[in-house]
A protein has these predicted regions:
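Glycine-rich oxoanion-binding loops at beta->alpha junctions
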Residues: 66, 70-83, 271-286, 309-345, ...
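Acidic/histidine-rich
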Residues: 153-187, 460-487, 522, 529
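Glycine-rich phosphate-binding loops that contact phosphosugars or nucleotide phosphates
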Residues: 289-423, 427-437, 471, 518-560, ...
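Active-site phosphate/pyrophosphate-binding segments
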Residues: 260-264, 268-295, 385-514, 586-603
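Conserved short alpha-helical segments that host acidic/polar catalytic motifs at enzyme active sites
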Residues: 1-246, 250, 262-269, 273-292, ...
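Structural motif
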Residues: 67, 95, 293-295, 341, ...
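Glycine-rich, anion-gripping cofactor-binding loops and their flanking helix/strand elements
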Residues: 180-202, 206, 327-361, 500-534, ...
Length: 603
């Protein structure tokens, strides 16, 4: 959600911060700001509502410095206004603070310590910076004032603090919100996402909860809140700087849709040997074989990927598998089996709801596996085991390639687990061949983009409502296709189990109501067709997407060959492209839909 950048050292701070903020745009934001200091008595604070370009246009050549902090804000406390934008400044204009997270006791702190202080914003962050300043006025150093403030606040935070009286130092603190230190040559950077600072360095230190960091141009000192020094390892982030660029594509989403065939091939290459045998860490395989039940915990698109993965684990590995929404599981944990293993799916690896569950079940002693696209993420670091999606940066808010990568990796893990346990179903399932079919089939569908654009225009050009139906994994992909359409086109789209239409939803069918029917499950294809005919009889405009061996001449889209259990790897390409073109035709920003953030780092 909110994004933080900071720099101190021999760099042009204004340009470093602006470029970093631009690379954080994909996370979602409604305002932005920066503070820069030249360490020679000149500093500047600029904040604006709107896009980064609005902030950039507000700067002139006088806004320069060798250290500073920047922020993109996603409103959680207070409306999107200039006053509520970060950085926040203390009334004595000594301290400047940026913050990602939520301080849950801000009101209590204000009442207890700041009754005589006039606040100019509605944010929890201003309470923190004013509290630091109030403590400093008692004679405490900036660092000690920050330490004492951290001992008082409750909630989640990633802080970057500048003391105007000591601009050669930058203070950083973290609790339950991601924050990285980037190591440079006579400079250091701070960021909530390595992607924002990859043009500066590829060496990053992932901070842990309770870390307090003092940065200068040449030093990084990490302590716990009680002053105990700690050492955190530095990791090299292997990523081509150009991977985060759109290249020839008008939008990141279209680029990422087109990258999915390559992602399928990359996953096979990463997790299999020359003989086509799946290679997973031995410790992970031992853990998985202890499971009497798997619990997949996820949110949003990742939850939908889990719904596709669950039957793969049950059919190939013979392990009962449940899929849970993280936001529900965190507060309403079901009765667990005797030997559960938890699998967490998250594109960003920073989803707050999922981390809450991870911390909870680890405290209960249960083994955990994170599957994510970001190797430096909190979920990757804190789980017992970690597998990377290797999908490359996903910048568009609407997830595409991470979804299909999650399904593909679930298939690889399910096959490996089933094979290790001698399951005949696993032996009969050639997952490498199926993922090769997925890659070629995805490419075929991508090349039919014009057909899908025309279909999207016919179905969704003026509609306010749309329905996607299917059974089994087709129901799972219906949920995801509906989510894609509603996310970026603002159409009230819903995915339903086709058999449930008659239990209420069919009452919503009117003349020309668009209904997309997925028909890839041989066990239920006839029933889904019957449901499609039923809504057509009531005036619905039906678009049928059918498996190659189940297709009829009047089906509008026939899929390339693939095992039915992996059909979502193909059907969702149609759903993604139709959503993309609907948003495009309606004139919306495909990559940055309203009210949505790419990385949901607060509950």
């Amino acid at each position: 959600m909110c994004g933080i950048v900071g720099v101190i050292g021999n760099q042009d701070a204004t340009q470093v911060l602006l470029r970093g903020l631009e690379r954080l745009e994909y996370r979602g934001y409604d305002s932005a700001g920066l503070y820069v200091n030249d360490q020679q008595g000149h500093d500047h604070l600029i904040k604006r509502v709107g896009r980064i370009r609005v902030l950039s246009e507000a700067l002139d050549e006088t806004v320069s410095g060798t250290m500073g902090i920047g922020h993109t804000r996603w409103a959680t406390n207070g409306r999107p206004t200039t006053a509520n934008a970060h950085p926040h400044v203390s009334n004595d204009e000594r301290f400047f603070l940026v913050h990602n997270g939520v301080i849950t006791n801000a009101a209590a702190l204000r009442d207890a310590y700041l009754q005589d202080v006039d606040l100019v914003s509605d944010t929890d962050t201003e309470v923190v910076v004013q509290l630091i300043a109030a403590l400093a006025r008692t004679g405490l150093t900036a660092k000690v004032a920050l330490q004492q403030t951290l001992g008082l606040v409750e909630g989640s935070y990633a802080f970057a603090l500048v003391d105007r009286l000591d601009p050669a130092t930058l203070y950083v603190a973290k609790n339950q919100s991601p924050l990285l230190i980037g190591l440079g040559d006579h400079f250091n950077v701070v960021t909530s996402d390595a992607l924002a600072m990859l043009d500066q360095t590829d060496r990053f230190v992932a901070l842990q909860d309770g870390d307090l960091v003092t940065l200068t141009a040449d030093t990084v000192t990490i302590e716990q809140l009680d002053g105990t020094p700690v050492v955190r390892p530095a990791h090299t982030v292997v990523l081509n700087d150009g991977d985060a660029e759109k290249g020839p594509y008008p939008y990141y989403m279209l680029k990422e849709i087109n990258e999915q065939p390559a992602v399928m091939r990359r996953l096979v290459a990463r997790y299999t040997d020359a003989a086509g045998q799946i290679q997973l860490p031995a410790a992970l395989m031992r853990t998985l074989q202890t499971a009497d039940r798997l619990y997949i915990v996820a949110a949003g698109t990742s939850y939908h990927a889990g719904l596709v993965g669950a039957p793969l684990f049950e059919q190939l590995a013979g392990v009962p598998t449940e899929v849970h929404l993280a936001s529900e599981f965190g507060y309403h944990q079901p009765l667990l089996s005797a030997h559960p293993v938890f699998i967490f799916l998250s594109q960003s690896g920073e989803t707050a709801d999922i981390r809450q569950v991870l911390v909870k079940v680890k405290a209960q002693g249960h083994p955990t596996l994170t599957i994510t696209n970001v190797e430096t993420s909190t979920l990757a670091r804190e789980a017992d085991h970690f597998l990377t999606l290797a999908a490359g940066p996903e910048i568009a808010v609407a997830s595409t390639k991470a979804y299909t990568a999650q399904i593909a990796l679930e298939a690889l893990v399910a096959k490996a687990l089933g094979a290790a346990q001698g399951r005949a179903a696993a032996a009969d399932f050639d997952v490498v061949h199926q993922l090769s079919l997925a890659a070629s089939g995805q490419q075929t569908l991508i090349e039919e983009a014009d057909v899908l654009h025309a279909a999207a225009r016919d179905l969704f050009a003026t509609t306010r409502n749309a329905f996607f139906i299917g059974r089994g994994v087709d129901h799972a992909v219906s949920l995801e296709a509906a989510l894609k359409l509603k996310e970026i086109s603002y159409v009230q789209a819903e995915g339903f189990a086709a058999g449930e239409l008659k239990h209420g939803t069919i009452a919503l069918i009117e003349q020309e109501t668009p209904v997309v029917a997925f028909i890839t499950d041989p066990l239920t294809a006839a029933h889904t067709r019957s449901n499609a005919e039923e809504v057509a009889a009531r005036g619905a405009k039906v678009f049928r997407i059918a498996a190659h061996d189940l297709a009829r001449p009047d089906d509008q889209l026939q899929l390339p060959p693939i095992d039915a259990r992996l059909s979502p790897l193909l059907t969702i390409i149609a759903g993604q492209l139709m959503a993309y073109y609907t948003s495009l035709d309606r004139g919306y920003d495909v990559d940055r839909p309203r009210n949505l953030a790419k990385s949901v780092t607060v509950e």
